[in-house]
């Protein structure tokens, strides 16, 4: 006896499942109605479905739609083009009956789509397309049963119910009246119906998050308990979910079954291949609702959204510093451990971050691949180009919350904030002098070492600071880039221009503590103070 509200189907002999039995072909119009995220989901589901069917060892040539997906083409078909693919699904009752009598092989078919993906489909245009296709092309075996009265649930038990598009490998007598999907157990149907109702009766008592299935709640609880029951026999690494362990095993076996047809790169997971293919297609389906910025992966979007929320869930156990991205925390922890796993093959210099090593390689090659579109200046690092471009745009996105002063680079803001906090974390090992910026410490240490690494190619004179060399070079070139707006006089140094402008403004910021006399230059005040010392 079926449970109330559940509609049993007549038992059917077990049949082989082919890709054609489960494929959903889309027309050009239907494909156009899907958004980027839904197209990505469709690609993922179709490729995974085909992979599961192929794993059963069933014969058959590769479907056209799979070839289209592998080539990165839009997987829609012209009207009538999918007839061959769909004819086995739309046969009449006699053809269905003959097929069922001839095909009684017992196959254990794996699930073609996960519960999460199925839940996502119900909330998307892709589900709507499937529902419309289902309504117009039921693909059922007509029944001669007469129409009888409706039951208490508004259903007529005598009316033939459309079978789902998938040909079940086992008896599935319970059908969903919303979408026509069939199930072997009434409990599975009840779980499925929560997709349509939105009911989530299983609530986590720790964080309050709700789920439609108790099994999903059980997996979620392991986040709070830290339980990882699935352990790798090779290396002992443990996982919360069995599917994660299965994927991890491929690291040891070296298996990479999913290959990119564009560049030949292979991946252990289909999802990684799909993500990689967006590099070639330029697709960025994950859009931030706050600023509109788009990303090619959902995890990158989640990390980005923390910029808006200020959330920093990853904390360092050593110093308590928090980070919005786990990768940044791992890089930071190397400050405490001193680990520098990335070594330059040219000079042997080691780095704590791989991206810094890649940038360092440009020092040896001389490569400067990043060019400014405004002035043509080239840079070895993309981040340096971005900072440079703000000179042209005059953008200063990093503002101090204390005084409102804005900066071009985030590192400059960090250094500036130490003016307010008084923090000077960089200490000289020779004399104990402390500095707020690491660059200032490096420059100071040259006083003790006598190092002057910046040499003039014209006269051979050397300097401890690069900025001093740049100013010196203007002696040879005669360049005077700093011009007074009041009188037009030009200067080779910005500091000299500032001093000169005080002639026009009358500003005298340097005052003598003895007699109160003021001067427009600090050097003039020093000379004046010697008068008091002589007296």
From Swiss-Prot:
Alphabetical keyword list: DNA-binding, Isopeptide bond, Metal-binding, Nucleus, Repeat, Transcription, Transcription regulation, Ubl conjugation, Zinc, Zinc-finger
Superkingdom as given in the UniProt entry: Eukaryota
Zn-finger region bounds: C2H2-type: 174-196, 202-224, 230-252, 258-280, 286-308, 314-336, 342-364, 370-392, 398-420, 426-448, 454-476, 482-504, 510-532
Coiled-coil stretches noted in the UniProt entry, renumbered to this chain: none
Residue span, KRAB domain: 17-88
Gene Ontology CC terms, in alphabetical order: nucleus
GO MF terms held by the record: sequence-specific double-stranded DNA binding; zinc ion binding
Keyword DNA-binding part of the UniProt annotation: yes
Pfam families the UniProt entry points to: KRAB, zf-C2H2
Intracellular or extracellular location(s): Nucleus
Main location: nucleus
Family according to the record: Belongs to the krueppel C2H2-type zinc-finger protein family.
Name of the featured protein: Zinc finger protein 250
The species this protein was found in: Mus musculus (Mouse)
Lineage: Eukaryota, Metazoa, Chordata, Craniata, Vertebrata
């Amino acid at each position: 006896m079926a449970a109330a509200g559940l509609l049993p189907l007549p038992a059917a002999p077990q049949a082989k499942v082919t890709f054609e039995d489960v494929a959903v072909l889309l027309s050009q119009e239907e494909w156009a109605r899907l958004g980027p995220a839904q197209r990505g989901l469709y690609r993922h589901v179709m490729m995974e479905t085909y992979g599961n069917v192929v794993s059963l060892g069933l014969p058959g040539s590769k479907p056209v739609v799979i070839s289209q997906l592998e080539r990165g083409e839009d997987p829609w078909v012209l009207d009538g083009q999918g007839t061959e693919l769909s004819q086995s699904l739309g046969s009449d009752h006699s053809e269905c009956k003959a097929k069922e009598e001839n095909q009684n092989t017992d196959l254990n078919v794996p699930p073609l789509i996960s519960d999460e993906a199925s839940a996502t489909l119900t909330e998307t245009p892709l589900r709507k397309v499937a529902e419309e296709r289902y309504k117009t092309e039921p693909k059922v075996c007509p029944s001669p049963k007469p129409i009888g009265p409706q039951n208490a649930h508004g259903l007529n038990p005598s009316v033939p119910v459309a079978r789902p598009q998938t040909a079940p490998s086992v008896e599935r007598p319970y059908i969903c009246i919303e979408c026509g999907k069939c199930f072997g157990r009434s409990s599975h149907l009840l779980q499925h119906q929560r997709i349509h109702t939105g009911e989530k009766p299983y609530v986590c008592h720790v964080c309050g998050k709700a789920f439609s299935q108790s099994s999903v709640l059980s997996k979620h609880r392991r986040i709070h308990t830290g339980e990882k029951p699935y352990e790798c026999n090779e290396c002992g690494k443990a996982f919360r979910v069995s599917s994660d362990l299965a994927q991890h095993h491929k690291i040891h076996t070296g298996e990479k079954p999913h290959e990119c047809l564009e560049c030949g790169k292979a991946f252990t997971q289909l999802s990684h291949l799909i993500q990689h293919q967006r590099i070639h297609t330029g697709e960025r389906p994950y859009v931030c609702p706050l600023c509109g910025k788009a990303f090619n992966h959902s995890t990158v979007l989640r990390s980005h959204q923390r910029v808006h929320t200020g959330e920093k869930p990853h904390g360092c156990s050593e110093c308590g510093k928090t980070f919005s991205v786990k990768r940044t925390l791992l890089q930071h922890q190397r400050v405490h451990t001193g680990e520098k796993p990335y070594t330059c093959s040219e000079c042997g210099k080691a780095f704590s971050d791989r991206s810094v090593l890649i940038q360092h390689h440009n020092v040896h090659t001389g490569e400067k691949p990043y060019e400014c579109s405004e002035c043509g200046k080239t840079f070895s690092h993309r981040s340096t180009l971005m900072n440079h471009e703000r000179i042209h745009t005059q953008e200063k996105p990093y503002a101090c919350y204390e005084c409102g002063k804005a900066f071009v680079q985030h590192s400059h803001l960090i250094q500036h904030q130490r003016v307010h906090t008084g923090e000077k974390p960089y200490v000289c090992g020779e004399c104990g002098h402390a500095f707020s910026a690491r660059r200032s410490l490096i420059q100071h240490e040259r006083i003790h070492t006598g190092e002057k690494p910046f040499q003039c190619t014209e006269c051979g004179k050397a300097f401890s600071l690069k900025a001093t060399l740049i100013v010196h070079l203007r002696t040879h070139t005669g360049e005077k880039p700093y011009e007074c707006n009041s009188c037009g006089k030009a200067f080779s140094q910005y500091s000299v221009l500032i001093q000169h402008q005080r002639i026009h403004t009358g500003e005298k910021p340097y005052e003598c503590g003895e007699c109160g006399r003021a001067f427009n230059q600090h050097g003039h005040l020093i000379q004046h103070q010697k008068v008091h010392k002589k007296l």
